[in-house]
Design a protein with these regions (language model features):
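Amphipathic alpha-helical hairpins
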Residues: 10, 61, 67, 71, ...
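Rossmann-fold dinucleotide-binding core
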Residues: 94-171
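Helical "substrate-binding/catalytic lid" subdomain
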Residues: 162-285
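Rossmann-like NAD(P)(H) cofactor-binding subdomain of soluble oxidoreductases
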Residues: 52-57, 61-63, 68-129
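NAD(P)+-binding Rossmann beta1-loop-alpha1 motif at the extreme N-terminus of oxidoreductases
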Residues: 1-64, 86, 121
Length: 288
């Protein structure tokens, strides 16, 4: 079975490394050729393609991990004529509606799965990410067998789009939580507490502490916003959530408010940095 990966961004590169280390990855493609060439230097047995469709022709299983709906659609649409008996696993976070429409076309010939990730780039390296899978159960065990090389927790959610629905539920909470965490931290500083005092309360003592607070509080204290999950991506996900909520007539006022806070954070130059940098938005806009 030949496996190819399309998309070598923050998450995709690390997933590809996990598969390559276990000798199950054959091909890679990225729209930035230098990334694919860099990967080839590290893993000589992996071939890189200059064209995603050519990669797909040579692969039995194609994994995509891309930035947004447009990127996924532009890659998947040309694969429809050659999808016969192929398994396509899209690990991007996009609209479930977009994913479902693509799945209908692919599933007429092959097998399409949405398989978004819960977890950071560090969790990918540790193989501790959660992968939520939506798609035909018929080939799920094959999909799971491949993904176990990069995750120890793979959950079948149901039909096409249901993996993404689960991911969006998670990201609504994560997006709002990070904003609330930053607001509380900023409030504590304004009250005269030290960063260390606030960090200890929020990450160790609070009943609202979580893996997110334990990971992100040190980043805030140290001003280290190296990207694990970017501001632009959480803002993009909240935008998807808001649009989907209208389709399902669901009330998401906190998602709407929080999306605007991340937009402000982007406008201040933090778009590509870790989404914990929303704390800097609070500091810059705090009135003294």
């Amino acid at each position: 079975m030949k496996v190819g990966i399309i998309g070598l961004g923050i998450m995709g590169y690390r997933i590809a490394k996990n598969l390559a280390k276990d000798d199950i990855l054959n091909y890679v493609y990225d729209r930035t050729p230098a990334k694919a060439m860099e990967f080839k230097k590290e893993f000589e047995n992996v071939e890189y393609f200059n064209d995603p469709t050519e990669l797909a022709k040579s692969s039995d299983v194609v994994i995509t991990i891309l930035s947004d709906d447009n990127a996924v659609t532009s890659i998947i649409k040309p694969l429809i004529p050659i999808a016969s008996n192929k398994i396509i696993i899209d690990m991007s976070t996009i609209s479930p509606i977009t994913s479902y429409e693509l799945a209908k076309e692919i599933n007429s010939k092959g097998y399409f799965y949405d398989a978004p990730i819960i977890g950071t780039s560090i969790a990918v390296e540790n193989k501790s990410i959660v992968i939520l899978v939506g798609g035909p159960y018929e080939k799920f065990e094959t999909v799971k067998e491949i993904l176990t090389h990069t995750s120890n927790n793979i959950v079948y959610m149901g039909g096409n789009g249901f993996g993404l629905k689960g991911k969006l539920v998670n990201n609504l909470l994560i997006g709002v939580y990070m904003a609330a965490l930053s607001e509380a931290f900023n409030f504590g500083l304004d009250l005269g507490l030290t960063k260390e005092q606030i960090g200890y309360i929020l990450s160790k003592l609070s009943s609202a502490r979580s893996p997110t607070s334990e990971i992100k509080i040190p980043k805030i204290i140290n001003g280290d916003y190296s990207t694990q999950f970017s501001v632009k991506n959480i803002r993009k996900d909240l935008d998807i959530i808001i649009n989907i909520s209208q389709h399902y007539n669901s009330l998401v006022p906190l998602a709407s408010l929080t999306e605007n806070l991340y937009k402000i954070t982007e406008s201040l130059g933090y778009s590509s940095l870790d989404f914990s940098s929303i704390f800097e938005m609070y500091r810059k806009l705090t009135l003294k």
